[in-house]
Amino acid sequence: MAVKVGINGFGRIGRNVFRAAVKNPDIEVVAVNDLTANADGLAHLLKYDSVHGRLDAEVVVNDGVSVNGKEIIVKAERNPENLAWGEIGVDIVVESTGRFTKREDAAKHLEAGAKKVIISAPAKVENITVVMGVNQDKYDADAHHVISNASCTTICLAAFARVLHQIFGEVSRMMTTAHSYTNIQRILDAATHADLRGARAAAESIIDTTNGAAMAVALVLPELKGKLNGMAMRVATANVSVVDLVYELAKEVTVEEVNAALKAIAEGELKGILAYSIEPLVIRNYNGSTVSSTIDILSTMVIDGAMVKVVSWYDNETGYSHRVVALAAYINAKGL
């Protein structure tokens, strides 16, 4: 039976989670809460997306929004505790406003009647951070009620970092992500951003900024704690990002050995989560990719036998949203 989901925050991730859910028979979105638009506006942005194109579904506005004949309740409530999720049958809330990332704040959805909350962002003092394909076996249905789905960069990195660690071992790693701009940035220069680099026009610069994804990997792979760090370069593209990971191994390897290990896991245990490409593709070719991470096989490098570079692409909206939906289905399967 499909789990009933409510989405709090219908921005880039909220809408992409909905799009992913439409294709998944194990998920039924029954309600959306968002302060920024009425039902007409929400339906329009759901149906027509500047990055991902038109939604292949019938979207109709009535008292709420109907998608493929199923009614979606639309709310505009500022306080999560007032959303009455229980009264409308919501089992799991996807918290995608970016505002309620602390456990005590996200837990207000539980007070409103939801059984579980998935935060679509790195969280603070959450019950657990889960990356599908990496540590979902650590989830405890009885103990974990506020769950973080980590970040898009973390799920990309963790998908192949675990493989490399288990097979080859390492001394240390350094990561850089070239990340498409997001709504937290500015279209034009504005002094309202706490980070002066982040205050600059998103489409006019490559913007050096911090990124917690590397250290956050240790939340799902504790064995990498203190062995991984990194940064981000925000670039002038609307979607899709790429991780460049350089790491020092404890033993010598070849490019062929590294690629063979990654191919094997992508075709086996992590199929649908980790993929690889042997073609000379560019950023636009990965738009719409539903996996967490796609290894660019042609870009793998080895120097002096033990210094290795691996490059992996990820659709930071679509891939991430599909992992949110997969996590919701997994939680439901484990019992609410």
UniProtKB/Swiss-Prot annotation:
Catalyzes the oxidative phosphorylation of glyceraldehyde 3-phosphate (G3P) to 1,3-bisphosphoglycerate (BPG) using the cofactor NAD. The first reaction step involves the formation of a hemiacetal intermediate between G3P and a cysteine residue, and this hemiacetal intermediate is then oxidized to a thioester, with concomitant reduction of NAD to NADH. The reduced NADH is then exchanged with the second NAD, and the thioester is attacked by a nucleophilic inorganic phosphate to produce BPG. Belongs to the glyceraldehyde-3-phosphate dehydrogenase family. PANTHER family: GLYCERALDEHYDE-3-PHOSPHATE DEHYDROGENASE 2. Disulfide bonds: none annotated. The record marks H179 as: Activates thiol group during catalysis. GO terms for molecular function: glyceraldehyde-3-phosphate dehydrogenase (NAD+) (phosphorylating) activity; NAD binding; NADP binding. This is Glyceraldehyde-3-phosphate dehydrogenase. GO terms for cellular component: cytoplasm. It catalyses: D-glyceraldehyde 3-phosphate + phosphate + NAD(+) = (2R)-3-phospho-glyceroyl phosphate + NADH + H(+). The active site is at C152 (nucleophile). Its EC number is 1.2.1.12. Pathway: Carbohydrate degradation; glycolysis; pyruvate from D-glyceraldehyde 3-phosphate: step 1/5. Keywords: Cytoplasm, Glycolysis, NAD, Nucleotide-binding, Oxidoreductase. D-glyceraldehyde 3-phosphate binds at S151, C152, T153, T182, N211, G212, R234. Homotetramer. It is an enzyme of class 1 (oxidoreductase). NAD(+) binds at R12, I13, D34, R78, S120, N183, N316. GO terms for biological process: glucose metabolic process; glycolytic process. It is found in: Cytoplasm.
